[in-house]
């Protein structure tokens, strides 16, 4: 089996592709897998570290308005299509899978024109521009959220698979998680995470909670992100950081921290939501503003509408508001249980298996 995977720009596009590659290797150890990305995207570092070869094509993002930049981008796109054609013809894949980002455009388009089986995976509720364009060309469209169905025209191509995540999120037990994070207090644990790079506004809201409200009805475990750790820690009054509250730059055992918490406060990236719902945790989602096509707000609202999360817009966030929302949830065990049940219902714990099955079905189709 020979497979090309293409996805890039951000971790949200790259990690699902790596999960799919790992599942293929698990089922077919001799499978030949090649990634196609861009040299200036995160994939140029992440993919080789994961142990997979990668080749690069030329691509540039498009602005929503007519501009000189778009003229240049169109020229680069034509070059990228030619480069993708050369790579695909040399590698001779059985199937080409795209996981989003502008790099998928030339790769999946050319694969479809060459008569090769194609599939794209969409991580967010509101699909990215590239995947919306590829809708007409590809054979199958795998969705992480059922709510995304309404944004695609070719309904017969759609299948809800979920977003693949690390298996250890499902493997960690409550006992193991509690042994690491609930040894020194019986108070409810609130995990606050702003994503791999941290979230400045979320960190500031938690600092405000610690300095002004000094909560004693719950414990805070704040993961600031390495870049924001020092400045965040320096903003917290010494007396506010009681022994029951913890501040870390990063945690290496997120599956344990997530399993141990009673409530998680986080941004609304697709992978984060997939992890939270896989273990069925109640959440307060704070979608990051100014993301591509505001996709985090769509993700957050989908969870909020199903009762799995409470949503706070980033421009409305403050320590006072966050503290009140935390207490409203944590203070009512029935609310927590109801949110946990809704969250677990939305979780898809076998996403990689589902995507692999769809890939196999495409390959077996005559």
UniProtKB/Swiss-Prot annotation:
Catalytic activity from the UniProt record: di-trans,octa-cis-undecaprenyl diphospho-N-acetyl-alpha-D-muramoyl-L-alanyl-D-glutamyl-meso-2,6-diaminopimeloyl-D-alanyl-D-alanine + UDP-N-acetyl-alpha-D-glucosamine = di-trans,octa-cis-undecaprenyl diphospho-[N-acetyl-alpha-D-glucosaminyl-(1->4)]-N-acetyl-alpha-D-muramoyl-L-alanyl-D-glutamyl-meso-2,6-diaminopimeloyl-D-alanyl-D-alanine + UDP + H(+)
Binding site for UDP-N-acetyl-alpha-D-glucosamine: 10-12, 124, 166, 196, 296
Gene3D superfamilies linked to this entry: Glycogen Phosphorylase B
Highest taxon in the source lineage: Bacteria
Protein's membrane topology: Peripheral membrane protein
One MF annotation (Gene Ontology) recorded for this entry: undecaprenyldiphospho-muramoylpentapeptide beta-N-acetylglucosaminyltransferase activity
Subcellular localization(s) per the UniProt record: Cell membrane
Pathway membership: Cell wall biogenesis; peptidoglycan biosynthesis
GO cellular component, one term: plasma membrane
E.C. code: 2.4.1.227
Keyword Cytoplasm: no
Keywords: Cell cycle, Cell division, Cell membrane, Cell shape, Cell wall biogenesis/degradation, Glycosyltransferase, Membrane, Peptidoglycan synthesis, Transferase
The protein's name in its UniProt record: UDP-N-acetylglucosamine--N-acetylmuramyl-(pentapeptide) pyrophosphoryl-undecaprenol N-acetylglucosamine transferase
Organism for this UniProt entry: Alkaliphilus oremlandii (strain OhILAs)
Gene giving rise to this polypeptide: murG
């Amino acid at each position: 089996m020979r497979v090309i995977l293409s996805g890039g720009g951000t971790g949200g596009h790259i990690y699902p592709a790596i999960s799919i590659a790992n599942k293929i290797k698990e089922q077919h150890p001799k499978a030949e897998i090649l990634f196609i990305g861009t040299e200036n995207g995160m994939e140029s570092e992440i993919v080789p570290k994961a142990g997979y070869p990668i080749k690069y094509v030329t691509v540039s993002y498009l602005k929503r308005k007519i501009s000189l930049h778009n003229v240049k981008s169109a020229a680069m796109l034509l070059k990228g299509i030619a480069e993708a054609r050369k790579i695909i013809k040399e590698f001779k894949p059985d199937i080409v899978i795209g996981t989003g980002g502008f790099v998928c455009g030339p790769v999946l388009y050319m694969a479809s024109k060459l008569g090769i089986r194609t599939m794209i995976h969409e991580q967010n509720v509101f699909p990215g521009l590239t995947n919306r364009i590829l809708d007409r060309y590809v054979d199958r469209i795998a969705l992480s959220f059922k709510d995304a169905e309404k944004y695609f025209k070719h309904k017969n191509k759609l299948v809800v698979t979920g977003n693949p995540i690390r298996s250890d999120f499902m493997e960690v037990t409550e006992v193991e998680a509690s042994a690491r994070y609930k040894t020194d207090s019986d108070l409810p644990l609130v995990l606050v995470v702003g994503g791999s790079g941290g979230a400045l506004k979320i960190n500031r809201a938690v600092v405000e909670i610690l300095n002004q409200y000094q909560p004693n009805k719950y414990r805070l475990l704040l993961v600031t992100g390495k870049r924001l750790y020092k400045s965040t820690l320096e903003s917290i009054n010494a007396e506010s950081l009681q022994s029951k509250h913890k501040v870390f730059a990063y945690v290496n055992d997120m599956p344990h921290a997530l399993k141990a918490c009673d409530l998680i406060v986080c941004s609304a990236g697709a992978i984060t939501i997939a992890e939270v719902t896989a273990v069925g945790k109640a959440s307060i989602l704070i979608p990051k503003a100014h993301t591509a096509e505001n996709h985090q707000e769509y993700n957050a609202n989908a969870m909020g509408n199903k009762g799995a999360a409470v949503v706070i817009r980033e421009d409305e966030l403050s320590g006072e508001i966050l503290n009140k929302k935390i207490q409203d949830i944590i203070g009512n065990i029935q609310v927590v249980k109801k949110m946990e049940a809704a969250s677990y219902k939305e979780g898809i714990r076998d996403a990689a298996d589902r995507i692999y099955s769809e890939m196999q079905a495409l390959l077996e189709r005559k």
